[in-house]
């Protein structure tokens, strides 16, 4: 079931264990961004695709940010499935479908994520060649279910392993119990304020829109701690909401039509009505309060 996205499962009582989704979710929680970065993702199988998709939704720290994601691997089919990737401004996605790169190019990146294969030896080979060829100063993250073996080869300072089997199993438990529960509470708050469909009757797209928002809360918490005002957090939350819809190929239209994937709120934050802005601000405040309970 690894190729079946959780977001395609309509039954709210069924959860699919996805290594790739868990891995991506846990990676960005463990190694969050603190400022705009130039990021290399080497390898673009399931893990790499999810690293990008989750990164686009949680790496929102400033309305004026500029992240650049360089994808080294064939993204042809991915772009066919996700036709609105050009709507991720102010961030940018650059595809290198051949998967090839000059080692010297890697010196310009702020982080390198190697996730091309589930094979430990393949990813280790890539990492070893990079470290041998150029004096990379940025963090190099290596996807491997056996992090202890890689650490013994390279030492703790040069390679940061993620995606260990033990960590992912633990992350899945946390996701089921905490993230889904937080998403449900968030939706219930919205329903109490504005009305709507009960959680159990939501389709998978809307249910996972709440999950995406709940995933973003760890980023929002860090921004709150730094004194980011609620209005800015609301704008970032709106950017996340738009990205979630664009990832699923929605477009803007004057009149919302869910069946045709058209929504009237797919506009920059400053173009929203004051009523819609208030909804975003109240949602941020409610989630902040929820985290203190």
Please give the residue ranges for each predicted region.
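Cytosolic regulatory regions of ion transport systems
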Residues: 1-235
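Protein-protein interaction and targeting regions used for scaffolding, dimerization, and localization
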Residues: 184, 188-293
């Amino acid at each position: 079931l690894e190729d079946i996205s959780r977001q395609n499962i309509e039954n709210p009582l069924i959860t699919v264990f996805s290594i790739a989704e868990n891995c991506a979710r846990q990676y960005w929680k463990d190694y969050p961004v603190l400022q705009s970065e130039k990021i290399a993702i080497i390898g673009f199988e399931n893990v790499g695709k999810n690293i990008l998709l989750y990164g686009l939704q949680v790496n929102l720290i400033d309305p004026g940010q500029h992240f650049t994601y360089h994808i080294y691997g064939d993204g042809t089919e991915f772009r066919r499935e996700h036709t609105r990737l050009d709507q991720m401004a102010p961030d940018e996605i650059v595809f290198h479908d051949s998967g090839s790169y000059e080692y010297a190019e890697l010196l310009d990146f702020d982080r390198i994520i190697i996730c091309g294969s589930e094979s430990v030896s393949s990813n280790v080979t890539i990492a070893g060649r990079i470290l041998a060829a150029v004096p990379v100063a940025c963090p190099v993250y290596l996807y491997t279910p056996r992090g202890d073996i890689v650490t013994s080869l390279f030492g703790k300072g040069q390679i940061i392993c993620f995606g260990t089997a033990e960590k992912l199993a633990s992350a899945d438990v946390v996701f089921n119990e905490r993230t889904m529960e937080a998403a449900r509470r968030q939706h219930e708050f919205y329903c109490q304020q504005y009305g709507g469909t009960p959680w159990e009757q939501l389709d998978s797209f809307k249910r996972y829109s709440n999950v995406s928002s709940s995933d973003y809360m760890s980023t929002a918490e860090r921004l709150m701690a730094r004194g980011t005002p609620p209005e800015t957090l609301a704008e970032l939350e709106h950017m996340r909401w738009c990205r979630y819809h664009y990832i699923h190929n929605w477009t803007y239209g004057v009149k919302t039509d869910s069946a045709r994937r058209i929504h009237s709120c797919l506009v920059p934050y400053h173009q929203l009505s004051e009523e819609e802005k208030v909804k975003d601000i109240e949602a941020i405040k409610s989630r902040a309060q929820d985290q203190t309970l």
